[in-house]
Amino acid sequence: MLLKDQVALITGSGRGIGRAIAHLFAKEGAAVFLTARTDKELATTTGEISRGGGRSGYATADLSLESDCAQAVAAAREKFGRIDILVNNAGHYGPVVPVEDYPLVDFDKVIAVHLRAAFLLSKLVLQEMYARQSGVILNISSLSAKAAYAWGSGYAAAKAGMLGLTRVTAAEGARKGVRVNAICPGPVTETQMSKDLGAVLAKKMGVNEDEQLAGFLNGLLQGRAQTAQEIARAALFLCSEQSSAMTGQSVNVDGGVAFY
């Protein structure tokens, strides 16, 4: 087992990529503590993990709030005693509009859920990790941080900011036993966020949803979407000792779009 006896705090883990990461980490021996905004999905996911013989716990949290970030970390420590791995995965796309029409309140919300929450949660776990000279932080960024797509300025800015945070935190933690990396997923069309976004984009483009998706996927070298399980496998690699020489990296899992 690649994560035996490790404790992982995984945000945005009631469904989609976070849920897939939680299941795989539990299968590989980690105790997983999950957060999301809704109780029902968390209860379902932790129940599945427990029935499979894994260890899990959860707390609902709105990670745009500093108080909820602190409460999530405290709840994970209360449940399992420590945090060895932090996966910042919570996500919110925001309005699909051009920059000139993007409401500031929505921009601030997207930045808060992605970048600000990743900063706050990292800040809350780093002292513990430094004291042990051991720990891993993984930030789930996006292809949008590297490729240019219209109508998503808040999301792109937040995800690009996460890459900067990744590099700085990696530089600070490298001699203290802490590794920090990021994943930039491409389109994971099975997630609700991707489905909702596709519907909005199709309407703006004057095509149906299947046509919009086919056109987008045609721009990928592999010509297909990624799966949540593929992102989870990359997350497992980056959070295990198999990637012990890697820190400060942003790993593209995008089917062949970004090459840096």
Q: Where would I find each of the regions flagged by the language model?
A:
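Conserved glycine-rich cofactor-binding loop
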Residues: 7, 12-16
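Short C-terminal tail/terminal secondary-structure segment
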Residues: 93-96, 235-236, 247-260
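Substrate-binding pocket helix/loop in short-chain dehydrogenase/reductase
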Residues: 97-99, 103-111, 198, 216
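Active-site helix of classical SDR
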Residues: 122, 158, 166
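Alpha-helical segment proximal to the catalytic Tyr-Lys
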Residues: 127, 171-172, 244
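Residue(s) in the substrate-gating loop at a strand-loop-helix junction
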Residues: 142
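Short, small/polar-rich loop/turn modules that mediate ligand/substrate recognition or access, typified
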Residues: 174, 179, 246-248
